[in-house]
Amino acid sequence: MSEPITAEKFAIGQSVRRVEDPRLIKGFGRYSDDVNLPRQAYAVVVRSPHAHATIRSIDTSAARKARGVVGVLTGADLAADKLGDLPTDKSRKRRDGSPAYATPRPALARGRARHVGDPVALVVAETMEQAVDAAELVAVDYEPLPSIGATADAIRPGAPAIWAEAPDNVAFVWEAGNKDAVARGFAGAAHVTRLDFVVTRVAAAPMEPRGAVGEWDRRTGRYTLHTGIQAPHGLRTLLADQVFKVPHSDLHVITGEVGGSFGMKSGVYPEPVLVLWAAKRFGRPVKWTSDRREGFVTDEHGRDNVSTAELALDANGKFLALRVAITLNIGAYLTPRSAGPGTNNVGGIAGVYTTPAIHVQTTGVFSNTTPTGPYRGAGRPEATYAIERVIDVAARELKIDSIELRRRNLIPPTAMPFKTGLVFTYDCGDFARGMDMALALADRDGFEKRRAEARRHGKLRGLGIANPIEVAGGPYTAMNPDTASLRVNADGSVSLFTGSTSMGQGNETAFAQIVADRLGVPPERIQVFWGDSDALGAGRGNGGSGALTVGGSAVTRATEKIIERGRRIAARLLEAAPEDIVHKDGKFTVTGTDRGVTLANVARAAYVPRQLPQGMEPGFTEEASFTPPAVTFPNGSQICEIEIDEETGAVRVLRHSVVDDVGRMVNPMLV
């Protein structure tokens, strides 16, 4: 029999197995597709097979007559019901300073489809099979139009316009850094390195596809949406304010388990709108689940930019200035998330180096492709790729060892806090130490011997290094708060409601560890709840590497407020002054004595009015919010050694050495 887990062994800093895993392994998780409601109908979306086309007509007559069909809806029905368009980004500017074109994006396209997969009609039927069959009967007359797929093609002279209102296909232009200082740095440089590079487009493809179930209660006029989303409160707000135009109290979003997201499930998509709208139209719940093929053309894509990086160096190899131009493919629509990867996290282009002057220009361009958004780092990997690759090229041109060139330009720990040449101010970090640890781990000193041995066997061997740094808890310029509500029940058990969602990172375990550590409560008496817009008034959700830094800090503040309330109740029970009460390991004691009561004793009293201090209302619940005063900067060093077969070109990764400075670890097993 395994040893029972105690609060002490479940404390902050302990390696603890994920408490959610037994539930998930046994199949007891509740994902979007697990939601099935009485009288539920099923929806299938008819989508454009063309990248760009005029929609001449939509004939739904045959589909409406098909077996089991509840109804067929088009963009005309959407307009008749006066639903608002999906949110866009109205904060961006074009090159001349004029506002970016706020692309209209109804949940069902009207008049024109602008990418493969653009939704055109919605078929609702009694069963999924009937909905699929009926969808094939919807006859759409398309007139194909010239289209743009490649990023570089979007801004070439004569390129077809995706939007008439943006004839040059430029959605926005954004700049950061000191352009004049960069120009001076390049003017005085002994050497300039230029690198043109492409970061290819990717699809997220999480294990769980997107899905949504919509309900409408005709008695209350209230919508309820079940969907796997990173930020239920944010989605509730956007749908209520901009699409359905109802009070927030009339739209309830519930998120259960989320089977992976990588940023993709934090967007606002047409399908949640469609199932809620259809539920009201037909007076019954409506369910939609994406299949894998559908997801590839409708889930937000990531990356996709064509960029140029220029690095100016003096005669000793010191970095003088860095200039980066990014052409970012945002796809067919300007969404609230389109610009993020090319703007929020470009500060990482400075890397861990002392480059005094940096300038970045990001040009977002339209194309006839699926909209893009944050994906796995949301611009951080692209930023690291830019600086680390241009350093490698400069080292090759100058015939300087690439590690030595990095070392000459690393920010020393004595320079902290360090204001980089681009946006960020690092509060701490010992970057040389991290790199040296990685070099030792990779046995860099023995590399040349291994390379020579590989040559004798007809193999090429190479060693690459990168020193990444990222922002956590951001975005940097708009740090959002998170909320936590903590209730100690009358039996001493604890219920935690958090504004952060869980997408497989182990949040349930980490948050429970914080509560157990702070309150001294055994983990089996802690329940963590998330993903319900009714349970908390606000919530940040999960994204930007902020679940623990922001959400965990909100939980910590809630425990502090619980302890303070408990001190006052304990003082009443122990007939002592509140300032004489201390809390440790789940017990309140009078300073200098052995007199005390447990948290469970205090909780029991908290619900009995006569046992409370004068003026205190019964109950033992506290809510706390946390807005980070600054972001954090996890950093590290990675070294990869590979071997290439000269005859076949086959590449084999031989070793990959990683050192990460992530700060304080709540659970090393989760890091």
Where are these regions (language model features)?
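Helix-loop-helix junctions that connect adjacent transmembrane helices in secondary transporters/permeases
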Residues: G158-F244, P412-S493
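Structured beta-strand/loop patches that form or line metal/cofactor-binding pockets in enzymes
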Residues: V286-A309, V471-G473, E623-E646
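Glycine-rich and small/hydrophobic secondary-structure elements
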Residues: D89-Q130, G263-A315, T372-E397, F418-D443, ...
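Intrinsic disorder at enzyme termini
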Residues: M1-F28, A432-A454, G462, P468, ...
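Glycine-rich loop/linker segments at domain edges
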Residues: E20-R23, D89, R95-T103, N169-A212, ...
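Flexible, low-hydrophobicity surface segments
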Residues: M1-D168, F172, L195, E271, ...
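Internal maturation/activation junctions in enzymes
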Residues: A452, P578, T591-P634
